């Protein structure tokens, strides 16, 4: 670049720096504006195709979900009053309606020792054997001589944690006595907790040995400090299904009706059974159909925005979508719409309109909820046949979309091409900057040379004038 001392025209009087800057800017501006437009348009298209690809992928996800046969094989179970029981079902359950009456809930064992005086300590060491059920091998816990009731409790809980039995102290503020209370883990008849103390620790006993050598348990008499026994006895749940009397060791019943699990909550009113209903999971299918419609409508909305021209006022230029005139986008929607009106192989439900899904003027889908509910209730298998399988609607729609979203597909090729264009803009801008810099250097040199030439001409002119003035006979005019 020319030396800065030569930028202003000393001899010519010209502002060379400003002249060169103006000429360079005039040369650069059109190309720079062209590159900016190209970069802006390309970036908008790149973003638009990314949005389109995302919308298509979302739609494909729900298409694949609706094409899964297991979606239509699912079963749902419900009860007429969840205050008394709740129910769930697997695909193995057969549709049906059952009457359930609950007369007794399953319960875990809760037992208590006789009362211990305030400040009690064991007089001798020994062992306590705790069993859950008379036939249980039990857990033996060592108790040291002089142990407080709290220390005995802590030793018990440390040894019983794997068995799930817990020991707590309940104090009587009236007389200062305390009892050890044991709570079992497992519900069901025969799961009562028994405690047997070795010699010197018999006051911890809960349950007695009968004449046959078996343990028996009596109910605790809360008014007697010497009484031990059960507060709550371990019991089976008792209930009936359609009049058949049944029992379960837990309140979770899963082997009475194939594929159905129900959770008993409380005893039902006498002679007022509740209803358990097992049916196809119509709610789950409907939710997925709604997701399909939402995803399709999102795709329509995205394409409309990207390909539309929106007026914003008489005095303003319209808003033009990034993909206006893009044939691939138009072809995508046209292909989808054509596929959706092709009849399926079924007889009752052959297309979306048969189940209450129709196309609005703007190209989006809408659902007639009442019609859809009725079709799902009366023609569930026909809906499954329309949607699923290699020739089902969901697979056909997915096949139309795959060429656009697959690796190396239509949209990926477009994105790659646009990325190349963005890179080329950067390359062209670098080349333009180099040309402009070269032009600026050249113009500065040319204008500097011109200014120097003018200086030389001025000097020559001055010398000639001086020489002429000194010639003989030359008379100067006054």
Swiss-Prot record:
Domain of life: Bacteria
Broad class of the protein's primary localization: secreted
InterPro entries, per the entry: Flagellin_hook_IN_motif, FliD, FliD_C, FliD_N
Disulphides: none
Gene Ontology terms: cellular component: bacterial-type flagellum filament cap; bacterial-type flagellum hook; extracellular region
Keyword Zinc-finger: no
GO biological process: bacterial-type flagellum-dependent cell motility; cell adhesion
Keyword Iron attached: no
Pfam families the record matches: Flagellin_IN, FliD_C, FliD_N
Assigned keywords, A-Z: Bacterial flagellum, Coiled coil, Secreted
Coiled coil ranges: 409-460
Record localization: Secreted; Bacterial flagellum
Known function: Required for the morphogenesis and for the elongation of the flagellar filament by facilitating polymerization of the flagellin monomers at the tip of growing filament. Forms a capping structure, which prevents flagellin subunits (transported through the central channel of the flagellum) from leaking out without polymerization at the distal end. Essential for motility. Responsible for adhesion to mucin, which is the initial event in colonization by this organism of the airways of cystic fibrosis patients.
Record text on subunit structure and interactions: Homopentamer.
Family: Belongs to the FliD family.
Protein name: A-type flagellar hook-associated protein 2
Biological source species: Pseudomonas aeruginosa
Lineage: Bacteria, Pseudomonadati, Pseudomonadota, Gammaproteobacteria, Pseudomonadales
